[in-house]
Amino acid sequence: MSEANKAVARRWFQEVWNERKPATIAELMHASAVGHTSSGETRGPEDWKRRVWDSLTGAFSDIKVAVDATVAVDETVVIRWRATMVHTGDALGIPPSKRPVAINGITWMTVHDGRIVEGWDGWDATGMIVQCGGATLDQRLSK
């Protein structure tokens, strides 16, 4: 089961992010899936697509995600990843800078019967803001 769940996670990153196939979101995410991010919770694939995928693909082009490590135990899959992109749209209120951005993150997901039922994402939002030109690191640290 763990290997099949790892395959779901790898497919998620490859198709949803690298190939920009939004149809894969509904295919791999259960209708009642819950997503947890620093900006709140999403409910189901349409909500996740609108609040996460549309926001990121609208703000960044050339998104590429490399999966560096994947660990699975039963229905739990943890993925360590790194992403590169170009800031070409409004991101977190920061106008397009055309700058390259690189972030690291971790995704923890629960996969049941081949579909993602819950997920947690953690990534370097401060680093993203700095790279987009929204603040210098010194400004972020002084707050």
Which residue ranges define each predicted feature?
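Short, low-complexity N-terminal intrinsically disordered segments enriched in polar/charged residues
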Residues: 1-31, 137-143
